[in-house]
From Swiss-Prot:
Induction: By stress conditions e.g. heat shock. Acts as a chaperone. This is Chaperone protein DnaK. The keyword Phosphoprotein applies. Keywords: ATP-binding, Chaperone, Nucleotide-binding, Phosphoprotein, Stress response.
Length: 644
C-alpha cells in the first residue's frame, strides 16, 4: 500500500508532507522550495503554470493568473464577501449556472475546485518525485470554520486531481498533532491561533495521555473564513492607491496591470516590515497619462502599517473569546499558545495574542509547515503506521432544519465531537399534509434564512392525518470529515428518504467526472510537451556536435559527405522551428545517417594513429573525436536539464 500524503491546501501557499519513520517530513518542490504559491496561470499558448512560475508572470498576465481562489470555494456568487473580492482582484469572478462563484479565464468558466485541483496536482507530483512511487491517497486540511459545502468542494478538488481524499482534517487540529507528537507526556490544554492567507481559525485542544495513547480532543473551534493575510495586503493596496491618487489624480483600480504590481509590492513591504521599522515602496512607470509616465514612491513605516491593519488583528480576537467561552475555560487555563499561518509572523499579531493570553506564544512550531506535517501524521494514523494517536475533532457550526415560522431548529450543536449521529421527531404543520420538505441549514442564527442553506429534499406519501399527528424522524449523521448525511423517515409507514449533503448547489458527480477527464487530458498534453522538448534538445545537441565535427574534419570530409551533412542540418533546423515531434525525430535520424560515414572514417583514422604510437605516451586524443564526444555529452546534458 502506498503512502498517504498530507497536504495543506492554503489560500496563499500550499505544502506537502509525508511520514518517514516516526517523523513528518516536508517535501521540497521541483524549484527547491518547501512551500508552493497557490497560484495558477493560463498562458497564451494554453500552458497551465502552477506555483512560483505562475507567480513570476502574474504582472504581465494579470487577467489569467488566479490567486486566493480558496476564498471562493463552496461560496455563492451573491455572497457579500465574494462581491467585495470582485472589486479587488484583476481576474474575473462570475456566477455559475447553479449560483456558485466561479472564475472566468479566456472566456472559459471554471469552478474553484478545478483551480485548486491544479495546485493539488503539483503537490501530488512533488510527493511522487520524492517517494519514487505513485501517490493516490491524501489527507487534505481545511480551515476549521469551513462549512459543509466548502469541505465538500475541497474533496471534489482532490478527486479532480486524481487523489482519493482519505480524510478532511481541520488546520488547527493538524497543527496541534504536529506540535503534540514529540512533546513530553502529560496532559495540557493548548490554543491554536491560525491566521493564514485567507482564513482565520482558533481551536482549543486538550492533549492527554490515555493508557499510553496520545489523545487530541478539540474542545471548541471558531473563526472567520474571510480574514487573513490577503486582507492585510488589501488594506495596504488601498492605502498606496489612495496616496497615488492624491498626488497624481489617477485611480489605479481601473488598471489590472498596475493593481497586480501594487499587490506584489504590498505583500513584499508587509513582509519587510516584520523585521524592519521602515521600507520604501518604489514602482517606476506604474501608469501614464497625457503628461507622461508616472512613478509610485511611498515611504512606509511599521507604525503606519499597524495603524492600517490593527482593526483586522482585533477582529481576530472576537472568535478567540468565543472559543474559550465555548470550551468552558478561562484564559489562564490555556497552557500553550501555538501560532500557525504566515501572517502570524507580524509583530503586532504576536503582541496582541501575547497580551490576550498573558503569555508568549510558542516559537518552536513552523507556522508554514505545521499544518501539512499534522496532515501527514493523520495519514499515517489512517494507514495504520501510527497506532498511539486518537483524534477527536468537532463540527464548527450548528446543524439543524427549518421548522414552522422559518425557525432554525438545531439537531447537532456546534463543537459536538465527530463522527456523531442525532435523531429528532417532527410532525406536520397542516391537516392532511402528505409531504414534508426537509430544509437543512448550518449556522448560529435563530432565523433559518440567515444561516447557510445546505440542501433540501422531500419526504412524500405521508398518510393524511390531522396536523401534529404524523411522526417524521429526522436523522443527522456527520462523518469524520465533517460531511453530513441527512435522512427522514415516516414512522407510521417506515418510508425513508435521505441525501448526502452536497450543498444546495456544488458540483454534480457528472461535472466532477468531466473535470477529472479534463485533468487527465491535460496530463497527456503535458507528457507530449515533455517528449517534444526532449526530442528538440536531442536534435539541437546533435546538430551542434555534427557542425563541430564537420568543421574540425576539414578536408578529410569528401564533397559528397559535406553536402549530405549540410542538407541534413538545414532540414533539422527547419524541423526545430516547426515544433513537430515526428519531423524532429525524422531529422535526427537523417543527421545521424548523413554524418555516420564521416564519423566512422575519423574513428578508423584515430585507431590507426593510436596503434602507431603504441608504447609512447599515448598521444593526444584527435580533435575530431574529442569534438564528437563533446557533442554527445552536450546532448545528454540538454535532456537532463529539461527533466529537472
Amino acid at each position: 500500500m502506498g503512502k498517504i500524503i498530507g497536504i495543506d491546501l492554503g489560500t496563499t501557499n500550499s505544502c506537502v508532507s509525508v511520514l518517514e519513520g516516526d517523523k513528518a517530513k516536508v517535501i521540497e518542490n521541483a524549484e527547491g522550495d518547501r512551500t508552493t504559491p497557490s497560484i495558477v496561470a493560463f498562458t497564451d499558448d494554453n500552458e497551465i503554470l502552477v506555483g512560483q512560475s505562475a507567480k513570476r508572470q502574474a504582472v504581465t498576465n494579470p487577467r489569467n493568473t488566479l490567486f486566493a481562489v480558496k476564498r471562493l470555494i463552496g461560496r455563492k456568487f451573491t455572497d457579500d464577501v465574494v462581491q467585495k473580492d470582485i472589486k479587488m482582484v484583476p481576474y474575473s469572478i462570475v456566477g455559475a449556472d447553479n449560483g456558485d462563484a466561479w472564475v472566468e479565464v479566456k472566456g472559459d468558466k471554471k469552478a474553484p475546485p478545478q483551480i485548486s485541483a491544479e495546485v493539488l496536482k503539483k503537490m501530488k507530483k512533488t510527493a511522487e518525485d520524492y517517494l519514487g512511487e505513485k501517490v493516490t491517497e491524501a489527507v487534505i486540511t481545511v480551515p476549521a470554520y469551513f462549512n459543509d459545502s466548502q469541505r465538500q468542494a475541497t474533496k471534489d478538488a482532490g478527486k479532480i486531481a486524481g487523489l482519493e481524499v482519505k480524510r478532511i482534517i481541520n488546520e488547527p487540529t493538524a497543527a496541534a498533532l504536529a506540535y503534540g507528537m514529540d512533546k513530553a507526556k502529560g496532559d495540557r490544554t493548548i490554543a491554536v491561533y491560525d491566521l493564514g492567507g485567507g482564513t482565520f481559525d482558533i481551536s482549543v485542544i486538550e492533549i492527554a495521555d490515555v493508557d499510553g495513547e496520545h489523545q487530541f480532543e478539540v474542545l471548541s473551534t471558531n473563526g472567520d473564513t474571510f480574514l487573513g493575510g490577503e486582507d492585510f495586503d488589501l488594506r495596504l493596496i488601498e492605502y498606496l492607491a489612495e496616496e497615488f491618487k492624491k498626488s497624481n489624480g489617477i485611480d489605479l483600480h481601473n488598471d489590472p496591470l498596475a493593481l497586480q504590481r501594487l499587490k506584489e509590492a504590498a505583500e513584499k513591504a508587509k513582509i519587510e516590515l516584520s523585521s524592519s521599522q521602515q521600507t520604501e515602496v518604489n514602482l517606476p512607470y506604474i501608469t501614464a497619462d497625457a503628461t507622461g509616465p508616472k512613478h509610485l514612491v511611498v515611504k512606509l513605516t511599521r507604525a503606519k502599517l499597524e495603524s492600517l491593519v490593527e482593526e483586522l488583528v482585533n477582529r481576530s480576537l472576537e472568535p478567540v473569546k468565543m472559543a474559550i467561552k465555548d470550551a468552558d475555560l478561562s484564559v489562564s487555563e490555556i497552557d500553550d499558545v501555538i501560532l500557525v499561518g504566515g501572517q502570524t509572523r507580524m509583530p503586532l499579531v504576536q503582541q496582541k495574542v501575547a497580551e490576550f493570553f498573558g503569555k508568549e506564544p510558542r516559537k518552536d512550531v513552523n507556522p508554514d509547515e505545521a499544518v501539512a506535517m499534522g496532515a501527514a501524521i493523520q495519514g499515517a494514523v489512517l494507514s495504520g503506521d501510527v497506532k498511539d494517536v486518537l483524534l477527536l475533532d468537532v463540527t464548527p457550526l450548528t446543524l439543524g432544519i427549518e421548522t414552522m415560522g422559518g425557525v432554525a431548529t438545531p439537531l447537532i450543536e456546534k463543537n459536538t465531537t465527530i463522527p456523531t449521529k442525532k435523531s429528532q421527531v417532527f410532525s406536520t404543520a397542516e391537516d392532511n399534509q402528505t409531504a414534508v420538505t426537509i430544509h437543512v441549514v448550518q449556522g448560529e442564527r435563530k432565523q433559518a434564512a440567515q444561516n447557510k442553506s445546505l440542501g433540501r429534499f422531500d419526504l412524500a406519501d405521508i398518510p393524511p392525518a390531522p396536523r401534529g399527528m404524523p411522526q417524521v424522524e429526522v436523522t443527522f449523521d456527520i462523518d469524520a470529515n465533517g460531511i453530513l448525511n441527512v435522512s427522514a423517515k415516516d414512522k407510521a409507514t417506515g418510508k425513508e428518504q435521505s441525501i448526502v449533503i452536497k450543498a444546495s448547489s456544488g458540483l454534480s458527480d457528472d461535472e466532477i467526472e468531466n473535470m477529472v477527464k479534463d485533468a487527465e487530458a491535460n496530463a497527456e498534453a503535458d507528457r507530449k510537451f515533455e517528449e517534444l522538448v526532449s526530442a528538440r534538445n536531442t536534435l539541437e545537441g546533435l546538430v551542434h556536435a555534427t557542425k563541430k565535427t564537420l568543421e574540425e574534419a576539414g578536408d578529410k570530409a569528401t564533397a559528397e559527405e559535406k553536402s549530405a551533412i549540410e542538407a541534413a542540418i538545414t532540414e533539422a533546423e527547419e524541423a526545430l522551428k516547426s515544433g513537430d515531434k515526428d519531423a524532429i525525430e525524422a531529422a535526427t535520424k537523417k543527421v545521424t545517417d548523413a554524418s555516420g560515414s564521416l564519423a566512422q572514417k575519423l574513428y578508423a583514422e584515430q585507431s590507426a594513429q593510436q596503434q602507431g604510437s603504441a608504447g609512447a605516451t599515448g598521444g593526444e586524443q584527435p580533435k575530431a573525436d574529442k569534438a564528437a564526444d563533446d557533442g554527445v555529452v552536450d546532448a545528454e546534458f540538454e535532456e537532463v536539464k529539461d527533466d529537472k
